[in-house]
Amino acid sequence: MLMPKRVKYRREHRGRMKGRAKGGTEVHFGEYGLQALESAWITNRQIEAARRAMTRYMKRGGKVWIKIFPSKPYTAKPLEVRMGSGKGAPEGWVAVVKPGKVMFEVGGVSEEVAREALRLASHKLPIKCKFVKREEIGGEANES
């Protein structure tokens, strides 16, 4: 499971997810990618489930790059506890994903295999996603 080795503070404010992703909006490592169309918190368990779905479908061929990392802790108070008396204990880790962010990349496989692998991965995530191709230098953006 993905999580930071150490953090400066155990608890964080929730924050707001405004606007589009600033960086990581293009396919850099592989030939194909899975791009977010909505903003959400993606947990480390969801990232791992998506990774397993992709690698299981691709078998031994190809390579997968995970371009998001769950660096934000989220907290929860136990059930049936009254309001107040401090913030809850850290429950897990999430990655903040905004629209336009390429979350996963795949390389070394055909387009059909990559499209199906990324489709299976998208079913494990709580947001709408789209399949994107790497932009060739000097060419137009190839998105489908």
Swiss-Prot record:
<keyword id="KW-0694">RNA-binding</keyword>
<protein>
    <recommendedName>
        <fullName>Large ribosomal subunit protein uL16</fullName>
    </recommendedName>
</protein>
<dbReference type="InterPro" id="IPR000114">
    <property type="entry name" value="Ribosomal_uL16_bact-type"/>
</dbReference>
<keyword id="KW-0689">Ribosomal protein</keyword>
<dbReference type="GO" id="GO:0019843">
    <property type="term" value="F:rRNA binding"/>
</dbReference>
<dbReference type="InterPro" id="IPR016180">
    <property type="entry name" value="Ribosomal_uL16_dom"/>
</dbReference>
<comment type="similarity">
    <text>Belongs to the universal ribosomal protein uL16 family.</text>
</comment>
<keyword id="KW-0687">Ribonucleoprotein</keyword>
<dbReference type="GO" id="GO:0006412">
    <property type="term" value="P:translation"/>
</dbReference>
<dbReference type="GO" id="GO:0022625">
    <property type="term" value="C:cytosolic large ribosomal subunit"/>
</dbReference>
<comment type="function">
    <text>Binds 23S rRNA and is also seen to make contacts with the A and possibly P site tRNAs.</text>
</comment>
<keyword id="KW-0820">tRNA-binding</keyword>
<dbReference type="GO" id="GO:0003735">
    <property type="term" value="F:structural constituent of ribosome"/>
</dbReference>
<dbReference type="GO" id="GO:0000049">
    <property type="term" value="F:tRNA binding"/>
</dbReference>
<dbReference type="InterPro" id="IPR047873">
    <property type="entry name" value="Ribosomal_uL16"/>
</dbReference>
<dbReference type="InterPro" id="IPR020798">
    <property type="entry name" value="Ribosomal_uL16_CS"/>
</dbReference>
<comment type="subunit">
    <text>Part of the 50S ribosomal subunit.</text>
</comment>
<dbReference type="InterPro" id="IPR036920">
    <property type="entry name" value="Ribosomal_uL16_sf"/>
</dbReference>
<keyword id="KW-0699">rRNA-binding</keyword>
<dbReference type="Pfam" id="PF00252">
    <property type="entry name" value="Ribosomal_L16"/>
</dbReference>
